């Protein structure tokens, strides 16, 4: 018998087709806050009601945020038990860590269980796990905790991504694509779970950028299952992951920073984040869609991380997008706020559900090609080219 060549081994290891999203699940904590009531609640719980001018500013931020409600694990009871979390800069990392190391994997499990149920295959067929969170750090990590909580095989190959920030919903899909396409038969469970217990803090008039975060961020977890060469007798493909790229925007150092300190995770934003993103977004689009021969940005479907309303407004204006292009993105911002890495996966879920409800021809609002954008610290941009699948009547 002739020896097998390295080329033959490599060929046998690789999948034939592109990585495909096969299922999506989402979860939120039970507790939620309405944006209209939040300024009163926030200034009361942080004992800051004497800061009347700042409260007015915060109220305007909340009014302009385009957010209707946000889910939060932190209840009034938890905050009353941990007064240091309500200060602007008080040592509170231990208390925050104690919450997130338990709650982040737990919320991730809820989303993952929904995705696995929709997928329809036994969980023993999951070969790889990618877990992503900006909330807390621990060893062994959330990837290990989730493996135990779900009862995955101990031999599942795990990847733990901490402290990536808002672009990471694109990063996890990029990594899942590489794993699925280079390991024949691989089924990758991807989980993004975010809880604001690390970033919640009281107001201060010298750092309005911190206050912006308090007006935008919410809690949520999303999970997807990614694999190539789907078994269509059981699996239901939703989107193909055609290409994935990451870049650091020019002249954007320090535009978004996060620092883990004794006081928790502090966020710093420059005012011109929307301008930096909108100015550079077309370059990323051209690089991604040039090879496919697409240059009309209204001819594709859109999933964009909703960092805040100003980013969406400026991208829409710069690219002359029709209002309906960011419908799914704006809906998720309105109903959940900015859930960091989990957002784009919530938007994918929203889009495929709406397309099915409205009888559209494909999972991409009736269109074939689409883009998924993640924006975050760096400024880092993730660009994923998606191909929708026809919706069977």
Curated annotation (Swiss-Prot):
CDD domains with a match to the protein in the record: CHS_like
Disulfide bridge map: none
Keywords: Acyltransferase, Flavonoid biosynthesis, Transferase
Catalyzed chemical reaction(s): (E)-4-coumaroyl-CoA + 3 malonyl-CoA + 3 H(+) = 2',4,4',6'-tetrahydroxychalcone + 3 CO2 + 4 CoA
Claim: Ligase is one of the keywords in the record: no
Pfam families: Chal_sti_synt_C (PF02797), Chal_sti_synt_N (PF00195)
Pathway: Secondary metabolite biosynthesis; flavonoid biosynthesis
Function: The primary product of this enzyme is 4,2',4',6'-tetrahydroxychalcone (also termed naringenin-chalcone or chalcone) which can under specific conditions spontaneously isomerize into naringenin.
Protein family per UniProt: Belongs to the thiolase-like superfamily. Chalcone/stilbene synthases family.
Protein's UniProt name: Chalcone synthase 3
Species lineage: Eukaryota, Viridiplantae, Streptophyta, Embryophyta, Tracheophyta
Protein's gene: CHS3
